[in-house]
Design a protein with these regions (language model features):
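Conserved small/polar residues in nucleotide/adenosyl-binding loops
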Residues: 1-3
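Active-site beta-loop-alpha junctions enriched in small/polar residues
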Residues: 7-11, 41, 88
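Residues that scaffold the ATP/ADP-binding catalytic core of kinase and kinase-like folds
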Residues: 12, 46, 175
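Structural alpha-helical scaffold elements that stabilize or flank donor/cofactor-binding regions
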Residues: 28-29, 76
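A short, active-site helix/loop in glycosyltransferases that binds the activated sugar's phosphate group
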Residues: 39-49
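Conserved phosphate-binding/catalytic region of the ribokinase-like
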Residues: 49-185
Length: 185
């Protein structure tokens, strides 16, 4: 099983060919990926897919645009068994709407929505989403649970400092079950 969390960083590609080289390399790698994770920028910059109607200021979430992008990606790469992304609408630097979607076996699964999530530190939210998603699949082999674990874990990580989540499984389950997305200490 090959899992790829697409994080495109222009500064890392600048001296070795820029965007064109990044797309060339990432398109080759994508042929071997089973689970592709990434946001709109990651899919567009790394693989060259366009998200029609996407708001590059992240002031609104266009779920249908992300679904169309993922459908395009899985057609181009039929080896993808799962494609997933977080959905973030930036309200302020410290307040975001947060959720996630996942494609698996031709169907979409959406997480609970976390409106006006209080952000302490955005760093690590995507990685925590990816780890929660993997846990949900490994533990339950259930796409809906996977996207819920991922979104809740990412939300919790965003409410704490640093890029390493200290949330427990119980806290993640409480969060996607309707509890607050704040780590209780």
């Amino acid at each position: 099983m090959c899992i790829r969390d697409r994080n495109y960083r222009p500064s890392l590609w600048k001296s070795i060919g820029g965007l064109k080289k990044a797309q060339e390399v990432n398109r080759e790698i994508a042929k071997y990926v089973d689970v592709m994770i990434g946001n709109e920028e990651d899919f567009t910059a790394s693989l060259g897919f366009e998200v029609k109607g996407a708001d590059h200021n992240l002031s609104m979430i266009e779920t249908d645009a992300f679904k169309a992008m993922i459908e395009t990606a899985v057609k181009a790469y039929p080896n993808f068994k799962v494609a997933a992304t977080t959905l973030r609408r930036v309200i302020t630097a410290t307040k975001n709407d947060w959720s996630a979607i996942l494609w698996h076996d031709g169907k979409f699964f959406e997480s609970r929505k976390y409106p006006e999530l209080e952000i302490l530190d955005r760093v690590g939210g995507g990685d925590s989403f990816a780890s929660g998603l993997q846990f949900g699949f490994l533990e339950f082999n259930d796409a809906q649970k996977a996207v819920e674990y991922g979104a809740a874990h990412g939300a919790l990580a965003s409410t704490t400092p640093g890029d390493t989540s200290m949330a427990t499984c119980k806290e993640v389950e409480k969060t996607f079950g309707g509890g607050s997305a704040r780590v209780q200490r």
